[in-house]
Amino acid sequence: MKLKTLSVGEVNNYVKKLVENDFILKNLNVKGEISNLKFHSSGHIYFSLKDENSKVNCIMFKNNAVNLDFRLEEGMKVEIKARLGVYHKEGTYQLYCENIKKAGIGELFEEFHKLKKELSEEGIFDEKYKRALPKFPKRIGIITARTGAAVRDIINVIQRRNKSLDIILYPAKVQGENAADSIIEGIRYFNNEKSVDVIILGRGGGSIEELWTFNNRDLAYEIFNSRIPTVSAVGHEVDFTISDFVSDMRAPTPSAAGELVSPSLQEMINDLLNKKEFLHRAIDRKFLNAKKDVDLLHKGLKGNNPKHIIEKRIKEVNSLEEKLNFLGKRKIDKAKDELIALNSILQTLNPLNTLGRGYSVIMDKKDKVINEVSELKKNDMVKVIMKDGSVNIDIKIINE
C-alpha cells in the first residue's frame, strides 16, 4: 500500500486533530515553574512552564485570566488545568490554561531572596556606600556580551548624545557557566587600568534563569569593592537582580544606562556657561572688595599725610596759644584787681593818711612810736611826724 504524500499543512492539521481528540491531552493537570512571564495589553497572559529537564509554552486568555485571585510572578511554582493545542501554521504546540493554582515559590526565587536578605544584612546595599556618577565622564567602560542588543543600545545612545566620549568594551559572558567570573574579570580590569570614569554592567532581557549570572555573591562583592562607580543595566524595567541592589545606580534598561552616564553636548555647554557666569560674578565681587580695601587704605594714607599732620599740629598750637593768652590775661586782670583791692586797704590803714586829718605821730630816737606820756622823761629827744614833715623836740616839761 502506497502512502499519500502530505503537505506540511496537512501534517500539522493531522497532528492537531489527534491532539485535540485525545481525552488526556484535553484534560491535563501540569505542575512546574513559571518563567518568561508576560502580561499582554489585550489581557492575555503568556509564559513558559518548566521543570528541571523540559519547558512548554503556555497561554491563558483574558476570559480565564480575570478569574485569577492572585498575580503570577516569575519563578512561581504552579499547577495548571489546561488542554494541549497545536498551532498548525508553525507546527508548534502549547498549553491553553483554564485555571492556575499556586504550588509554592520557585527554587531560584527562594535562592534569590535568601541571598538578597543575607547581603542586605551584611550592609553592602546601604545608601551610604552609593557614589554619585561623574557629571562629565571622559571614558565609559561597558561590560557585556560583544554582540547583542544590549551593547548596541548602550553605544548608540552614548554616541547620539555625545560623540566626544570614549567607549571601551570589555567583552564578557553574561549567561551560562563561568559568566559571573567573566564579569568579575572585567570589573578588575577597569579598576586596575584606571582607564574609565564609570562602568556599565549590561545585559538584555530574559527569564530569571538567563539573568541568574547577576545574582552571584562573588560578583556582588566585586561590584561593591569597585573603586569606579558602577551602573547595573540588566534586563528590562520589571527585572531585578542582586547587581541592581549593590551597584551605585540601577538603570531600567541598557539604553537608559547610556542616557545616565553620557551628558549631552548641550548639557556640557550649559554647564560651561553657568561656570562662566559664576566666575564673572566671583571676579566682580573680588574687584569690588579690592576697591573697598584700596579706598580704606587711601583714606588711611590721607589721614597720615605729614603735611596734614603738621597743619593739624599748627592748629592745635595756635589754639593752645590763644587759650594761654586768654588764661594769662585773665590771671593778670585778676591779680591787678586784687592789688587794687589791697592798695585800697593799705591806703585806709596808712597812718600817713591819718596825719592828713590833723593828727601826728611821736617817735623816739629809735623810731619807736610813743603812745603814752609815761614813756617819756625830761630832756628826751623825740621826733614829731606831721602831714607835711617832721620836727625834733626836746622834752622840757611833762604834764601828767
From Swiss-Prot:
Keyword Hydrolase assigned: yes
InterPro entries (UniProt xref): Exonuc_VII_L, Exonuc_VII_lsu_C, OB-fold_nuc-bd_dom
Reactions catalysed according to its record: Exonucleolytic cleavage in either 5'- to 3'- or 3'- to 5'-direction to yield nucleoside 5'-phosphates
Gene Ontology biological-process annotations: DNA catabolic process
Top-level taxon of the source organism: Bacteria
UniProt KW Coiled coil keyword: no
Listed GO CC annotations: cytoplasm; exodeoxyribonuclease VII complex
Catalytic class of the enzyme: hydrolase
Keywords, comma-separated and alphabetical: Cytoplasm, Exonuclease, Hydrolase, Nuclease
Protein localization: Cytoplasm
Enzyme Commission no: 3.1.11.6
GO molecular function terms attached to this record: exodeoxyribonuclease VII activity; nucleic acid binding
Family per record: Belongs to the XseA family.
Subunit structure as annotated in this protein's UniProt entry: Heterooligomer composed of large and small subunits.
Role of this protein: Bidirectionally degrades single-stranded DNA into large acid-insoluble oligonucleotides, which are then degraded further into small acid-soluble oligonucleotides.
NCBIfam families referenced in this protein's UniProt entry, alphabetically: xseA
Protein name per UniProt: Exodeoxyribonuclease 7 large subunit
Species in which this protein is naturally found: Clostridium perfringens (strain ATCC 13124 / DSM 756 / JCM 1290 / NCIMB 6125 / NCTC 8237 / Type A)
